[in-house]
Structures are given as C-alpha cells and as structure tokens.
Curated annotation (Swiss-Prot):
Residues 80-83 are annotated as: Involved in Mg(2+) ion dislocation from EF-Tu. GO terms for molecular function: translation elongation factor activity. This is Elongation factor Ts. Disulfide bonds: none annotated. It comes from Methylocella silvestris (strain DSM 15510 / CIP 108128 / LMG 27833 / NCIMB 13906 / BL2). The keyword Hydrolase does not apply. GO terms for cellular component: cytoplasm. It is found in: Cytoplasm. It comes from the Bacteria. The keyword Secreted does not apply.
Length: 310
C-alpha cells in the first residue's frame, strides 16, 4: 500500500472539492490510488467530480497558430511563470507554433527536428533560449485540426500576447458555406470549449474506459435496485454525463444560444452559411495539465486536523 502524503490529500481535494479528512479516508481505502479515491468519494456522495482531471502545475505557454484551413496548438514548458512573460520565450513559443502549422507537423520529435527561422532546428532554438534565459524549457506536445473546406477557429484564454496564454483551443468547421458566418461561429465554439472543457466531440469518440468507469460509478451508487430499474438509472446517468463531457451535447455557454446545445447551434447556422456545417474536430490544451509539482506547504492544515501526521 502506498503511503498517503499531505501532497496526495491536497491533490485529491483540488480535484474533488471534498473535505480533507474525507480525502484522507478515500486514499487510505484505495491504497493511495488517486483515481480510485475519486471514484470512492463519488460513490459516497462526497464529490461532484464527473471526469478525470489533471492538476495544472507546470509553467510556460500554450501557443496557437492558424493558417487558412489548418490550425495547431503547442505547449512549451518552463520552470517558472516569470519566463512566460519573457519576450524571447514568447517569440520562441509563437514561432514553434508557426513552424508546426506551416509544415503540418503533429509529432513532437519531428517538430524538434524541423527548420527554425535563422538556420537552426526547433530543438537548437530551444537550447539557445535555455542558454540565454538560464532556465530549462521543453516542447511538450503539439496537435492539429484541419478541414478540407471551411474554417478553423481559435481562442486563447489568459493571453499574455497574441496567440499565447494558459489555455489554447482550435476547432474545425467543415463547410462550403459563407466564411463570414463560419468564422465568428468557430471562435464562439472555441471560447465555449475553453470554458466547458469537453472530453470528446460526441459520445462515440469517448474513451471506452471512461464510459465503463462512469457506468461502474452509477451502478455502485444505486446498488440494490432491481436490475430493470438499475439499467434505466445508468442509462439516464450516462445521458447526463454525455451532456457534461461531449461537445455536441453540451449546453452553449453563450447567452445568445440559451437552452441550445453546441450541436444545435451548429445546425442552426447552416441556413445563414448557405451550406451544411460539420463540427469536425477540436483540440484544447491547458498549460501543464497532467504534470505534477511536489508541494510542501500543506503541513499546517494537516497538523491541525490530523495531529501532525497523515
């Protein structure tokens, strides 16, 4: 069994909103497994967490670049937030995104080996910035969205400069319709994605393991019900889950689209666009998601509630 630490309790609290002692008990009951502890809390009705989430801990920037019908998002990490405000680092992240979109690269290693303006490779440009700024930097990931016809919309949240920030989104609308209609629609959807953080475009795109996990939680929460009743409860619960995590089923956050799902908003735009519109794909990067930093400032609260030790 893994030893339960203060950092683990803090992490679980941030992911679930549950009380400290509930988090401690959950971790003890699940052998220190964070994901199992999340499910344990949900089954006990102590957490509202509905989907897997990663704590935002790394620093750096997410960069977005769009060229005609192609868009990319890249994440470049640094050691401190201070570097994210450095103009050289910002130029580096922005240029890497431009290289990726111009060359159509979605593999990190291929992007590192790509030509960087000035005669070096992307990897060499990063190394040069490390030497100049004096802080380690990493090209962590890159992803793209492309459409044959239509538009790719973008949105950057907490922007520190054009196309650079803490959350970056690109979304593709496949259509032969009027770009004057499609472009603002794509941006509104990108903004929605940044705020609502969907896991997939639609239910069929969800990881089967995520769906199976949700079914298990619903079944455990309603254990003891007759099989026929339980089946309906699980089915209803999954529909609610899909509305929370599938883009086309999510209620739009925009006041102009009140009581409409994103799927309905896109469908209704077809008349103004003059052609069918397909929501093809999206990418949402939040800076540092899935990367953990060690924490050492939680001891006081633990000491007060658990006599100094977990």
């Amino acid at each position: 069994m893994a030893s339960v630490t203060a950092a683990m309790v803090k992490d679980l609290r941030e992911k679930t909103g549950a009380g400290m002692m509930d988090c401690k008990n959950a971790l003890n009951e699940t052998g220190g497994d964070i994901e199992a502890a999340i499910d344990w809390l949900r089954k006990k009705g102590l957490s509202k967490a509905a989907k897997k989430s990663g704590r935002i801990a790394a620093e750096g920037l997410v960069a977005v670049a769009v060229h005609e019908t192609d868009g990319v998002v890249v994440e470049v990490n640094s050691e401190t937030d201070f570097v994210a405000r450095n103009e050289e680092f910002q130029a580096l992240a922005r240029t890497i995104a431009l290289v990726a979109v111009e060359k159509g690269l979605t593999d990190v290693e291929a992007l590192k080996g790509a030509h960087y303006p000035g005669g070096s490779t992307v990897a060499e440009a990063i190394a040069n910035s490390v030497a100049t700024i004096g802080e380690n930097m990493t090209l962590r990931r890159v992803a793209a969205v492309n459409v044959a016809q239509g538009v790719v919309g973008q949105y950057v949240h907490n922007a520190v400069a054009d196309g650079l920030g803490k959350i970056g989104v690109i979304v593709g609308l496949e259509s032969t319709g009027d770009a004057v209609v499609l472009a603002p629609l794509a941006r509104l959807i990108a903004l929605h994605i940044a705020a609502a953080s969907p896991l997939a475009l639609e239910a069929a795109d969800l990881d089967p393991a995520v769906v199976a996990r949700e079914k298990a939680v619903l079944a455990d929460k309603n254990a003891g019900k007759p099989p026929q009743v339980l089946e309906k409860i699980v089915e209803s619960g999954l529909k609610t889950f899909y509305k929370e995590v599938c883009l086309v089923d999510q209620p739009s956050i925009h006041a102009d689209h009140a009581n409409k799902t994103i799927g309905q908003v896109v469908k209704e735009a077809e008349k103004a666009a003059g052609a069918p519109v397909k929501l093809k794909a999206f990418v949402r990067y939040a800076l540092g998601e899935g990367i953990e930093k060690q924490e050492s400032d939680f001891a006081a609260e633990v000491a007060a509630a658990a006599s100094g030790q977990l």
